[in-house]
């Protein structure tokens, strides 16, 4: 594995319609196919005229034109009356999903729960998708939405018990909603067709919506799961088969917890973090490392190695893989992934799957690292060339002077 000292070009992107900084906290950024199309949420009330709801809102920004568009509005254009966050766009950025506590984004929202919505940026419509087939409201909170790159499917976690007839466990489960047919399907299903016996979270979806990865404490999703750990699973929605991903190349299960999965568009590569020491030879650092499972070859590889092949001296968090399966972005507080990392806080890095080259992205254009504020909430573009992340550091862009957490684009 190689560590690359190459620096990134970093730009502030959580700006108002006038190109100025807001007075609130901005975060949860995401990218579509284009580096210029960015979604994020913000508590700022001065990003556009008329923001009077005193709540976090979701935005779309075209960095090539400076256009800023509010996403957390009803079809009639009314701002949500409660917090909206975690916007994620389809590849073409025409559809954006997000979660919201607002009750006025669609008619008939009376459940008083966190729901998942999709904003159609072409037709300027807003639709609730955390519903049962037929449109029945969820009786529990729905969170962690992700949208398939083609914009057809949305996956999410929900503690609701009325979204599918197979759900009776009163625990968080994973669901997939088809925007074309309106059908909501239960994803985290046991081997006997019944509900999972544990908590399932953090879904990720392939390009065509066929494969869905998620983490779960359940022991009945696959046969022979008796370790009592949080594992990574992948469900094939076409065949109805679930496989365990957090295993070594010889098929032995991870002996410690694993989490935060993501997968390439074709479903071949699944990434995750794990404390397990048996997924890779020589893993004795007792930190969360980053792994990739190649479903075509059955090989599991550790991606986080430090300078000169050393084990990393910190943990890894929230990885995401580019749609083409070539680059992974992740956060880490390790100080030995690249030379010169002396700030003592979490940074954002990328790793090339083909070469293992690691690059720190959360630096200024001239290579200046940030100070006491961590960088996190990282997201990578479809082609793996661009990264967005959040940080309260004020020295990554000369135009950053608000003293708040902002969103940055790096490449």
Task: Name each model-derived stretch.
Residues 1-6:
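C-terminal segment of classical bacterial N-terminal signal peptides
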Residues 7-411:
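Conserved "turn/edge" positions that cap or connect secondary-structure elements
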């Amino acid at each position: 594995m190689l560590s690359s000292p190459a620096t990134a070009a970093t730009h502030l992107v959580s700006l108002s319609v006038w190109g100025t900084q807001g007075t609130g906290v901005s975060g949860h950024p995401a990218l579509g196919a284009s580096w210029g199309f960015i979604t994020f949420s913000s508590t700022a009330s001065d990003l556009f005229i008329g923001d009077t709801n005193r709540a976090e809102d979701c935005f779309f920004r075209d960095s090539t034109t400076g256009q800023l568009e509010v996403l957390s509005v009803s079809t009639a254009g009314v701002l949500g009356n409660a917090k909206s966050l975690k916007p994620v766009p389809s590849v073409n950025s025409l559809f954006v999903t997000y979660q919201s506590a607002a009750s006025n984004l669609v008619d008939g929202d009376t459940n008083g729960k966190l729901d998942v919505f999709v904003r159609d940026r072409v037709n300027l419509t807003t639709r609730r998708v955390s519903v049962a087939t037929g449109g029945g409201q969820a009786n529990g909170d729905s969170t962690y939405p992700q949208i398939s790159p083609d914009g057809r499917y949305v996956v999410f976690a929900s503690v609701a018990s009325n979204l599918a007839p197979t759900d009776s466990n009163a625990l968080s489960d994973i669901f997939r909603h088809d925007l074309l047919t309106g059908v909501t399907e239960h994803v985290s299903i046991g081997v006997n067709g019944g509900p999972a016996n544990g908590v399932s979270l953090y879904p990720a979806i392939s390009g065509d919506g066929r494969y869905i990865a998620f983490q779960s404490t359940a022991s009945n999703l696959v046969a022979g799961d008796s370790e009592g750990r949080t594992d990574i699973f992948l469900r094939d929605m076409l065949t109805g088969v679930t496989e365990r991903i957090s295993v070594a190349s010889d098929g032995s299960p991870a002996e410690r917890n694993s989490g935060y999965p993501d997968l390439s568009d074709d479903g071949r590569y699944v990434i995750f973090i794990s404390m397990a020491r048996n997924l890779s030879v020589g893993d004795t650092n007792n930190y969360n490392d980053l792994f990739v499972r190649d479903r075509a070859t059955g090989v599991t590889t550790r991606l986080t190695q430090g300078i000169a092949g050393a084990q990393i001296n910190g943990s890894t968090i929230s990885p995401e893989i580019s749609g083409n399966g070539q680059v992974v972005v992740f956060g880490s507080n390790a100080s030995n992934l690249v030379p010169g990392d002396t700030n003592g806080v979490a940074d954002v890095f990328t790793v090339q799957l083909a070469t293992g080259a690691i690059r720190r992205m959360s630096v200024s254009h001239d290579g200046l690292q940030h100070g006491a504020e961590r960088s996190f909430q990282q997201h990578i573009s479809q082609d793996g060339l661009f990264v967005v992340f959040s940080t309260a550091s004020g020295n990554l862009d000369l135009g950053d002077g608000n003293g708040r957490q902002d969103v940055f684009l790096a490449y």
